[in-house]
Amino acid sequence: MLFRSIVERGIGTMRLQFGSRPKDLLAAIGPGIGACCYSVGEEVRFDFESQFAYAPSLFTEVYDSDPVKTKYPLLFLTARAPGHSNIGPQIHLDLIEANRRQLLDAGLSASKISVVGECTACTRLPNGQRRYFSHRDEHGYTGRMLSVIGMIE
């Protein structure tokens, strides 16, 4: 899967091309969509669990907290084919932690990994405006952000 190979290939390429050692590397993560807002399907959970032993710790199940839906669930049922129900928890994935864990697995020490930790989908400025662009939250109609990879000789 792509999500696993980005960190592995990036660090592998740096080792081959530049002789970089993981213990000498610094990494910064974020901002990015947080586990609070990043819902995924069962297939994503399955893919992660097939590749990472720690995958279960990356997922949380979020249940609808609407008290009316909780008290009167039959009011919100829709006629859907078997197996296509949206009743049940949303599965949320912590991509930021997933990336941090992959960097650790690649040999970087925890002290060399900085995490911003702000969610691009829900972090707001004091005036209520978005602090970041969020492709997922804004359905693709967004500005852009920049990431930088550099090397100091």
Question: How should these model regions be labeled?
Answer:
Residues 1-153:
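Active-site microenvironment for binding and transforming phosphate-containing groups
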